[in-house]
Curated annotation (Swiss-Prot):
NADP(+) binds at G157, N158, G159, I224. The keyword Hydrolase applies. This is Bifunctional protein FolD. Pathway: One-carbon metabolism; tetrahydrofolate interconversion. Its EC number is 1.5.1.5, 3.5.4.9.
Amino acid sequence: MFIKLDGTKLSQKLKEDLAKKVNNQKIKILIIISDPSEASRIYVRNKINYCDSLGIQTEVYDLSKIDDTNQFIVEMNQKISLSNPNGVLVQLPIKERLDTNKIIENIPIRLDVDAFLYHRFDQDQKEKVIPCVLNAVLELFKEYQLSFLDKKILLIGNGITSNQPIVNYLNEHQIKFDLITKENSQLLEEKTKVADLVISAVGKAKFLANYQFKRGVIFIDIGIDKYFDPEQSKYLICGDFDYDKLKEIASYGTPTPGGIGPLTIYSLVKNLINLSEIQKVNK
């Protein structure tokens, strides 16, 4: 029997704990935008709405007109000094002409809500501020009593905010896995047939629809895209997997939307609250 890994339902449950932690505290997040696309603005709006519902202050700073990396960093840091937030979110993607890694490396560690710089955190911050997608997956596994152990694990894609933190986690815990990227994509077809757990972060609509998976597979869909549905004459949100098709043979899986997405926003705000608490202790 297939069980839907319901990220929306779980995030609503976990949100109650966040509300208790906030408890009328003054907490503020600064969101910096580089990409002017509608998709980025939707992502930002969802995060703002979530923060608003908890009484967390948000400020958006639009740097989408800047095409020089050094100027971007200077203006970002000037705004951080003026705004005095508890956390900073640089919304990805960053425009291609800018150096994403250099910008991320210049986010103050004490304000890094996405945990991009997790490798530079001290031990206390590492325990309390976890990369958002990784935490989303761990929360789902905890709720549905799933595990990485004793499984053939297949990761597809390794973006900085998606599968890369999961790669790091599995390596730290000495858990074996296969990773498919552009460099070895010719292996994808044979790997999907034998994997017990597949986590995909490609971001192409139903990218895996025509691949074969084993019966009982667990699938986690981090990718998000849209496709045109001629029957409804409109675009619909979807992930890398064909959810309706795969759930016929899978044991567990995440829908898109409603799977990983809501839990990444929860994880972001959880990190923000924990950063605020760390800052109070270190004052």
